[in-house]
Amino acid sequence: MLMEDADVLWYHTVEKLKREGIIRSEKVRQAFLKVPRYLFVLPEHKKWAHVDEPLPIPGGQTISAPHMVAIMLELAELEEGMNVLDIGTGSGWNAALAAELVKTDVYTVERIPELVEFARKNLEKAGYADRVHVIIGDGTKGFPPKAPYDRILVAAGAPNVPEPLVEQLKPGGKLIIPVGSYHLWQELYEVIKLKDGSVKVKRHGGVAFVPLIGEHGWKE
């Protein structure tokens, strides 16, 4: 597939998400156009990168459907200069989109070595390797060296909200995380940390993510 064809197909996907009200803000629309999904999929799946469905990536994992990533980014309300932590790097696409929105460094944690390598290659290709820092480790523990965070985005389903992630949020910060069953059914939680350290949870409907594995998540 020619790059021009991939760009046209991707443009139509982004415009469809806008028409459907999934992409609501111009800044998320522009980020999607600047960071196309086809740069983050396996070569054999590039021709399907514009389709609004998850696709397989190494390590038995998936790259999320475009509509799901858009929903999470709109909920996150990312602003320039925010300190963002991304859990479950996967392909690196979510972290690159976040970096494009905040215009500064983003930290992302991945437990599968094969995916760390895959994400780093994709980020290099897309031009975000200097701003997106991929750390290998247990994402359920967050990444304390760069805490506290304005936003934490989690691209895997947890049995409950991991306490270390809440602890690493700034007062007024937000955690976007799927919570629920191991077997691909969760609710999307928007967890807001209040100034007194307590949290308020808003639920945003059913989603389907791979499980969040780790000390404060599911066990392997």
Curated annotation (Swiss-Prot):
Transmembrane listed as a keyword: no
Pfam families hit by this protein: PCMT (PF01135)
Its job: Catalyzes the methyl esterification of L-isoaspartyl residues in peptides and proteins that result from spontaneous decomposition of normal L-aspartyl and L-asparaginyl residues. It plays a role in the repair and/or degradation of damaged proteins.
Keywords assigned: Cytoplasm, Methyltransferase, S-adenosyl-L-methionine, Transferase
Recorded GO CC terms: cytoplasm
Catalytic-site annotation from UniProt: 64
Subcellular location: Cytoplasm
Lineage of producing organism: Archaea, Methanobacteriati, Methanobacteriota, Thermococci, Thermococcales
Enzymatic reactions: [protein]-L-isoaspartate + S-adenosyl-L-methionine = [protein]-L-isoaspartate alpha-methyl ester + S-adenosyl-L-homocysteine
Primary subcellular site in the record, as a coarse category: cytoplasm
Domain of life, per lineage: Archaea
UniProt GO BP: methylation; protein modification process; protein repair
UniProt keyword Magnesium, yes or no: no
EC numbers on record: 2.1.1.77
GO molecular function, one term: protein-L-isoaspartate (D-aspartate) O-methyltransferase activity
Protein name listed in UniProt: Protein-L-isoaspartate O-methyltransferase
Protein family membership: Belongs to the methyltransferase superfamily. L-isoaspartyl/D-aspartyl protein methyltransferase family.
